[in-house]
């Protein structure tokens, strides 16, 4: 069984290396400090994410730095065993960082210009929704909208930080702003 566990660990660790290497390259390009997510995003031995410990470690580490690049999608147990979030887990890491630094806004850059009024595979030229509430976002996710990883919402909502979903390929687009309430 040790061989199977080792093979599984290597597969998980290897799947995180793309994010790790991209983070290294981006940090070097920007001249920012690289912070390995394995050092600041904590999981328990059973693979359960530990939000409280992560926020403590991440907040302390980022308080020391003016600028940092932190890869998404993975973290580690206390003994250094790499653990990954599910697909789209980089959204979660971004949300955790926004919470840790008490950001005014969490911008989540993706390949679409926010949440759309209709499925673009069915309705051509679907328009994006400019502003929605967290409650409306939850309802959209129940209907299959999957622009943002569901676990990325809680840390920023808890901290009162709005989310802006933006399109990397069309940065001029407004995207969708996700807030607690849209009116008084």
What are these regions (language model features)?
Residues 15-184:
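C-terminal catalytic "cap/lid" subdomain
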Residues 1-12:
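Single conserved hydrophobic/aromatic residue that forms the stacking wall/gate
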């Amino acid at each position: 069984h040790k061989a199977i566990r080792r093979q599984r660990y290597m597969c998980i660790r290897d799947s995180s290396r793309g994010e790790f290497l991209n983070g290294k390259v981006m940090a070097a390009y920007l001249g920012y400090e690289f912070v390995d997510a394995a050092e600041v995003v904590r999981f328990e031995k059973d693979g359960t994410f530990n939000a409280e410990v992560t926020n403590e470690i991440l907040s302390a580490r980022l308080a020391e730095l003016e600028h940092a690049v932190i890869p998404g999608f993975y973290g580690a147990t206390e003994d250094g065993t790499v653990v990954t979030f599910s697909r789209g887990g980089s959204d979660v890491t971004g949300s955790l960082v926004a919470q840790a630094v008490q950001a005014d806004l969490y911008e989540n850059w993706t390949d679409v210009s926010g949440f759309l009024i209709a499925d673009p595979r069915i309705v051509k030229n679907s328009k994006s929704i400019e502003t929605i509430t967290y409650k409306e976002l939850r309802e959209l996710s129940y209907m299959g909208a999957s622009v943002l990883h569901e676990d990325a919402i809680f840390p920023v909502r808890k901290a009162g930080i709005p989310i802006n979903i933006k399109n990397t390929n069309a940065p001029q687009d407004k995207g969708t702003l996700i807030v607690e309430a849209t009116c008084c």
